[in-house]
Regions:
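Gly/Ala-rich beta-loop-alpha elbow adjacent to hydrolase catalytic centers
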Residues: 84, 88, 92
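Conserved alpha/beta-hydrolase catalytic His-Asp/Glu region
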Residues: 133-187
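Active-site loop/oxyanion-hole signature of alpha/beta-hydrolase fold enzymes
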Residues: 37, 41-83, 248
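Flexible "cap/lid" loop of the alpha/beta hydrolase fold
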Residues: 94-97, 104-136
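Alpha/beta-hydrolase fold catalytic core
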Residues: 1-16, 37-40, 77-78, 223-224, ...
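Conserved serine/cysteine hydrolase catalytic core
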Residues: 167-222, 227-230
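Catalytic active-site module of serine/aspartate enzymes centered on a nucleophile-bearing elbow/loop
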Residues: 226-256
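Conserved HGGG/HGGXW glycine-rich cap/lid loop of the alpha/beta-hydrolase fold
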Residues: 7-54
């Protein structure tokens, strides 16, 4: 089986960072460098069907967690701290519950262990409407995408995935067809009986609805040692919207 693509920064205890749906390891480069400066060996990982990692029709959280298990083995990593955002948070939860011996501490950014109804249709439809055979620049792609996605920040996030497949031809790094087809799986919960008893921190954005006060019980059911903290002035992309507070709270947890 092919291995996941990653960028490794710094030296020290391994910190594995898992991006969200339609994201990539590069989304975490700025914070990754900050963690590396604090004496951590940061692994910015592209999950399957994302970034520079391999494409596959097989896609669910058991499989994604298994990919990370294999990555840890291939890199001979011990005592890992795992940080996952959104879809990457679900992967991280499943990994920690299935293979607790591999995960020393767990950090989850703005996602709870529950089912989320598919809600990315607008984004997927907008991306599918782009005819990359006729689009010759990022600006043109952005203008076309704006007809479907009004939020400039979301457009910029998505267009980070554009690259030159060959001279004059743009393509997406993510596997759009499979991800569009697997939207139900993205929202799925981790295994119902899954638990992880080691230190766990959930960080939620105060402007995000992904983790509500009602989710405390379900979080504690799966993660009895979980602490839930709020990042101010931040929505679902809390690490990008308030990186200073995200870094402070996450480092306090990592170093405790």
């Amino acid at each position: 089986m092919p291995t996941l693509h990653s960028k490794i920064l710094g030296e020290g205890q391994p910190l594995l960072i898992l991006h969200g749906f339609l994201g990539m390891s590069d989304n975490w480069k700025t914070l990754g460098n900050k963690y590396a400066e604090e004496g951590l060996q940061v692994h910015l990982i592209d999950q399957r069907n994302h970034g520079k990692s391999f494409h596959s029709t097989e896609f669910n959280y058991d499989i994604l967690a298994n990919d990370i298990k294999q990555y840890i083995a291939e890199h001979n990593l011990q005592n890992c701290i795992v940080l996952g955002h959104s879809m990457g948070g679900k992967t991280a939860m499943q990994l920690a519950c299935s293979y607790p011996e591999l995960v020393n501490k767990l950090l989850i950014a703005d996602i709870a262990p529950k089912f989320y109804p598919p809600h990315h249709h607008e984004i997927i439809n907008g991306l599918k409407a782009l005819d990359l055979n006729t689009i010759s620049s990022r600006t043109e792609a952005s203008n076309e995408l704006a007809k479907h996605i009004s939020n400039a920040g979301v457009r910029q996030f998505l267009l980070k995935n554009l690259y030159w497949v060959e001279k004059g031809k743009l393509g997406f790094r993510f596997n759009l067809d499979v991800l569009a087809d697997r939207m139900e799986q993205i929202g799925e919960n981790i295994d119902a009986s899954a638990t992880y008893n080691k230190p766990t921190l959930f960080l939620r954005g105060d402007k995000s609805e992904y983790i509500s006060p009602l989710d405390t019980d379900v979080i504690k059911t799966h993660f009895p040692n979980a602490d839930i903290q709020t990042i101010t002035n931040a929505g679902h992309w809390l690490h990008a919207e308030n990186p200073k507070e995200f870094l402070e709270k996450s480092l306090t947890f990592i170093k405790s």
